[in-house]
Amino acid sequence: MKHLLVTLASISLSAFGIEQPNVLFIISDDLTATALSCYGNKVCQTPNIDRLASQGTRFTKAYCQGTYCGPSRASFMSGYYPHAIKMLGYGSPRPAIGERATWAQHFKNNGYHTARVSKIFHMGVPGGIEKGTDGADDPASWTERFNSAGPEWKAPGDGETLENNADARKPGPVGGNTFVVVEADGDDLVHSDGKTAAKAVELIKQHKDKPFFLGVGFVRPHVPFVAPRKDYTDFLPYAKMQLPPKLKEDWADIPKAGINYKTSKNMKMDVRRQKKAVGGYYASVAFMDRMVGQVLDGLKEAGLDDNTIVIFTSDHGYHLGEHDFWAKVSLHDESAAVPLIIRMPGKKPAVCHSLVELLDLYPTLSNLCGLKVPGRLQGKDISKMMTDPAKEVRSAAFSVNGKGFLLREQDWAYIAYGKNGLGDEELFDMKQDPKQFTNLAKDPKYGQTLARFQKQMAAKLKEVRTNDLGLKY
């Protein structure tokens, strides 16, 4: 078996003529794929991420395993689903996995220099960023690690609190983990993401002669929406921002558990504030995109383009007013789907429509770099998609939040709430209803489809909890 694993890894590497490539893992925070121009956005232009997409494989059906920061990051870094490691909060996966190697640690154990800049495992934003603390980071994963402190909502500039400020009693930005927009004074290095990009470029230059695994975590567009003034130019005046189409009585067929924790109603955001929120989010994305460009330029200037696998993604998606939902957590596509781009030197650019999970990154990158793929990992190796984007490794992607579970097939989305998914349900025909306006779960015509998903969900939950961790579920 060991010989077979080595042989498969060698085949993967030889196909591209690469020997022990570097890994540059870039992750954004709270980024919806729909905000990127390479995923079809016509308003928010992201030329640097687009550049990466034009050179790599862009996945159109990639899904996170937890629809908010803590579970998602603990999952893809540990190699286990959130419920397997009992992580639905904001902690480290280390207590659950013991001495088992995380994704970065696996590379470290195999001779790679592993470095982290800013948020890879969970960090509180903005609180942890303001303080420059480690959050739920895992020291054993890294050879060296760096935090990028920034002023966040306290950055000098013109700011407004949009959430729960209908009477405008809060004259400027107040509080952090809330919908605040700040058109900030000063240059990029005032902010956490500017510092992160600069440190990443510095580390690339320092370690260019030894294989490295570099994790670069940008905190934008996570709230507060803070970016240099120049990144707001394309989105002013905010009144020109377009809100998504909405239906009257849209929530009538959505279970209570399916109503997102942030809505236009409970945030008391009128149309003006909603449009400004979209503009502030896009400005934050534009800033983050420029910082991605700086890192990619630094890699090229170091002469490492031809020996580095680059991954770009987000920890989960984000609602920008769809169904009058905002932010993350929801199990609808806007929140559960993520952008994913993998640039592999020597391969032709492609677009892959197969279902993949962030959990697949650990085994896939291990294989592509010639490392043994631990058999305990719950993700799947998708490396063959680099040469054959039509290849499929799963019939459904799986994601969770604190209230329920998602099974996402090519043509269907099934959401089950409650303990073990035995509560209320949502069922959407994604071919006929891609924006998920009509819940078919109670329609007798779809009884067979619903029954199939109920059986499938029970099997998936059993699979998640069947592992080597020795935990009681």
Language-model-detected regions and their locations in the chain:
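Sec-dependent N-terminal signal peptides
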Residues: 3-14
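Residues forming the ATP-binding cleft of Hanks-type serine/threonine protein kinase domains
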Residues: 431
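Formylglycine-dependent sulfatase
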Residues: 2, 16-419, 423-425, 434-455, ...
